[in-house]
C-alpha cells in the first residue's frame, strides 16, 4: 500500500478508537499513530521511512526482504519494547504507536502478496481469500480505498480540530466565571 493509505487507515482507527474507548483525540497521539503506520516499511529502502533510515533499511531488505520481519508479530513485539517508555509518559501514546504499527500490518494483508504475520513461519496472511478482491499497490482500487478512508477520517474529526474554532476545544468553559464576575461587579442574576 502507499504511505497515504497507511496514514489514512491509522487515522481512521485512531479517531474510531476515541469513540470506542472514550479517549480525547489530540494531535500528538494522532501524529504518533500516523508516523508509526509508516514504520514497518523500514525494510524497503525506496519507502519514505526507508530513505530516512537508509542505514537500517538496506541491511534489513538484504537479510530478510520486504514484508517479512517488520510486518510480523516479532516486529510488532520489537516496536512494543522500543515504545514501552511511552507507557510511563502517557499510556495512550504507547497504544497509538502500537496501533499505528498494527494498522500497517492489517491493511497490508489486503495486498495481493499479503504479509508474513507469523514470520519466520512461511505462512502468509492475506485477506480476502478471493485473490481477485485483493489490492495492487497504487492501483485504482487502492485509490478508491484511500478516498473512502479520507472521507471517514474527515467524518470522524470533531468540529474544533483544525477549524477556525480549534482554540475553543482545549479551553475550559468560562460560563460560570462570567456569572461570578458579573455578580462581583454589581450585576444581579435574574
Description of each model-found segment:
Residues 1-190:
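N-terminal membrane-targeting hydrophobic helices
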